[in-house]
């Protein structure tokens, strides 16, 4: 049974009262917790699912957990402060959808991907990349219900930009491999628009059109 413990002296004096009793609910109400709210119900459900039966908690812990849900009971990421980024049964289909995203986000990704490609000689370095900042900036521009799809769309552009850089370097040096020096000026003629114009949607992906009009999957 979920119990209340150590919330102010009053709660300490009557520690152990069942949270689902009338007295327990009255105490929660006096502490500013609406036990009829969707956030409260979501917290109780998640806490019950996390253990066999229900464990122990205190009022402040419940308040903290409730603050992690918005009015629609969508989880708010403590990292980004945004909702709509956790895959659930409700939004699962969104994570593989392609949608229109701001041109500014595509510009930001192109410029950063190019800079890091040159700095790391084409090696993807998860320790130093700042691309997560580009995604966060995008999510902040999007409606909550479009954030998963926007992230998927930006990933497709990110892959396309990186592949275009690889192709450009290999056009100059066919034996080039990631980690080897990149020939000076190898990426000078590449623009974001030139890459974007070659991409078409195929299901939940963006693929490159060939000269014949067919599509070519991008592999990076």
Residue spans for each PLM region:
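Type III/flagellar secretion export determinants
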Residues: 1-220
């Amino acid at each position: 049974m979920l119990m209340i413990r150590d919330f102010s002296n009053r709660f300490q004096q009557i520690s152990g009262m069942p949270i689902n009793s009338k007295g327990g609910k009255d105490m929660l109400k006096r502490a500013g917790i609406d036990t009829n709210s969707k956030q409260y119900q979501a917290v109780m459900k998640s806490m019950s699912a996390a253990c066999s039966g229900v464990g122990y908690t205190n009022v402040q812990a419940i308040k903290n957990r409730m603050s992690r849900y918005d009015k629609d009971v969508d989880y708010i990421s403590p990292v980004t402060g945004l909702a709509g980024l956790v895959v659930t049964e409700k939004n699962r289909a969104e994570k593989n959808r392609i949608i229109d995203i701001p041109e500014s986000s595509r510009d930001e990704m192109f410029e950063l991907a190019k800079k890091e490609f040159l700095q790391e000689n084409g090696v993807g370095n998860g320790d130093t990349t700042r691309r997560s900042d580009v995604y966060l900036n995008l999510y902040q521009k999007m409606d909550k219900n479009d954030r998963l799809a926007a992230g998927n769309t930006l990933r497709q552009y990110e892959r396309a930009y990186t592949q275009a850089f690889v192709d450009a370097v290999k056009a100059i040096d066919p034996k080039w491999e990631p980690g080897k020096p990149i020939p000076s000026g190898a990426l000078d003629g590449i623009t974001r628009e030139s890459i974007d114009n070659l991409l078409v949607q195929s299901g939940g992906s963006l693929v490159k059109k060939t000269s014949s009009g067919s599509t070519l999957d991008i592999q990076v």
